[in-house]
Amino acid sequence: MTIHRADLLLPGAGRAPVPGGAVLVDGRSIEAVGPYEELAAARPAARVRRWPGVLTPGLCNPYGPELLEQAYHPDPREADELGTEPLTGAALAALEMTESRWGASARRGVRRMLAHGTVAVAGRLRRETVADAVARSGLGFDERFEDPQGPPALDPLAGGRPVEDAFVLPPLDFEGRQADFAVFDVPGLSADGDPYAALARAGAASCVATVLDGRLVHRRA
């Protein structure tokens, strides 16, 4: 068992913030949510991970197809030639793309998503190698009934999207919930301030840790 504690916990679904909150993870599930002191007293033998900032449900990126099937994420070895940012449009059309290359690009794209607190993507993936890369990563799939507004972004909070709209449901305190959550090092967090506004300003690039299915899949160096 592991207790993940943070300065503030946002359970999601309109639940009240928990200062000094924590989640108790047992395998792939969240066993308990609440103030750290209560969880530590109930499970004194549990391992403890201390994170700065805000612990929230993991995020859903609404641009699954756009970021993984309509963009190429360069290999670091290609940085001198192609740069480091995703390539789209004419730059993508100029590349010789094979199924193997699409799969490798998707794996790199998934890693970048995990580094933004993403635990699920929305939108149907039609390319088999891309869908396989996402499935193997453990990312969840959400249905999408209309195209999202604004340009595709690795940050699910970009473009003024309400923070709670980006949270994957159910809330963290839902009984038996899968252990998918993220932690964001939000500057300027205060006891009397609005944590949602602070997180929106910081953006998902402030992610310091992402836990997917109980596994720590991203940790900022």
Walk through the language-model features, giving the residues of each:
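N-terminal metal-binding scaffold of metallo-dependent hydrolase/deaminase domains
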Residues: M1-A42, D165-G203, V211-A221
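Short, well-ordered secondary-structure micro-motifs within conserved domains or adaptor modules
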Residues: M1-T2, A46-R50, V54, F145-P148, ...
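Short loop/helix-cap segments at secondary-structure boundaries that form the rim of catalytic
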Residues: Y36-P44, A131-R136
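Divalent metal-binding segments
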Residues: E66-E128, L157-G159, A166-L172, D185, ...
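Hydrophobic/aromatic ligand-binding patch that stacks against planar heteroaromatic rings
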Residues: R112, A133, E175
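Active-site loop-helix segments enriched in His/Asp/Glu that coordinate
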Residues: H116-D155
